[in-house]
């Protein structure tokens, strides 16, 4: 049986999965990866730990399926995270600075005069979330990096580039548009790096990876790692990968990945839309054809459940929240705004901070757990309403994936608060499957995206709205009030 191997490098886990042509998982190996919090608002990872997790998991999957069965490899990854490394030694010059890291707020504030140019050409906002200011921080703050860049020793990449470089034994330094378009350095209209943006962020062009099409031959694995050379034929950022696997119809359907954050995407076609409070981005490029998307990125989604579990010790496992939420009939006025790293779309307030409001003497763990799940659904509605404003099109269905999509209370409440159906696919590993699809189309496993979707997509459950409109709007208006209380908090 021929398989495509997908390498999925997330924020908290690395997964390597072998998929058959019908999308079934033939083999899987995964490892948890740790985060480092050196200071408040800073989030890092050890790039060598990421690579080691990939290397070990890939080795285990290859042992399970056998080298002869492997058609190709695809890569998907957490986006915006930056790594700079010495291309001679392969050693990172600093830890990976993660997407949710806020240390570059001041850098972004000082560059505010360029925000219009940045928005118009990248589709993104001038915000610490994206890669460019993080790269600038490393260049300006880590000893010796500037000189080593001048000597041509140091190169930059997002996580996909770092994994690709290591897989190929340091031979290939490339990326693709779905990742490049998240750096604030890439012009999404011209599909190339923008010299003006490089000047704004003081980043030399010679450290940047070459940009391939998303579905193309990036290179071959080094024999010392995989035993034989295996073609690497597809790369997509994690959210674009899940969008690809959902088979979303343009402008009618939205996908939401319920992960550490919440990532909503709407496919918009062959011309870029530059939205006001959301993000315009590249979905993928296949056979010379570019597809664009609008994205709403919510910084804290499932992470608020992890916080209840790891920091407050209120629950033992994430699944406990479903039972707790269902055990009470309402939130009793308790709202939780989980602005741990500020607020992302559509507010983009880096100075917002988390609050739990409406607490009384009757408030119990059940109310806090329910408020956390409801916050995920409210933030999703915030983004969908903004998408509808930008496009003038009413969204007909939400397609869900990610860990928290397995929570039935959340999915039902999501349908209720939106007033539209929420569809959950049978396949849990949508992000990894999307990377397999983009790779397998180039390597001949599937003839087209349409064939890939037909072979692999299967709906497990559809949640239909049951809540009355008046009740829905009352809940949501209270949420909006709570958000106002959380905004600008660190500036007060």
UniProtKB/Swiss-Prot annotation:
GO terms for molecular function: ATP binding; glycerol kinase activity. Pfam families: FGGY_C, FGGY_N. Pathway: Polyol metabolism; glycerol degradation via glycerol kinase pathway; sn-glycerol 3-phosphate from glycerol: step 1/1. It catalyses: glycerol + ATP = sn-glycerol 3-phosphate + ADP + H(+). Sn-glycerol 3-phosphate binds at residues 11, 79-80, 129, 238. Its EC number is 2.7.1.30. One of its GO terms (biological process) is glycerol metabolic process. SUPFAM superfamilies: Actin-like ATPase domain (SSF53067). It comes from the Bacteria. Glycerol binds at residues 79-80, 129, 238-239. ADP binds at residues 11, 15, 260, 302, 403, 407. One of its GO terms (cellular component) is cytosol. Inhibited by fructose 1,6-bisphosphate (FBP). Keywords: ATP-binding, Glycerol metabolism, Kinase, Nucleotide-binding, Transferase. InterPro entries: ATPase_NBD, Carb_kinase_FGGY, Carb_kinase_FGGY_CS, FGGY_C, FGGY_N, Glycerol_kin. ATP binds at residues 11-12, 260, 302, 403. NCBIfam families: glycerol_kin, PRK00047.1. Key enzyme in the regulation of glycerol uptake and metabolism. Catalyzes the phosphorylation of glycerol to yield sn-glycerol 3-phosphate. Belongs to the FGGY kinase family. HAMAP family: Glycerol_kin. This is Glycerol kinase.
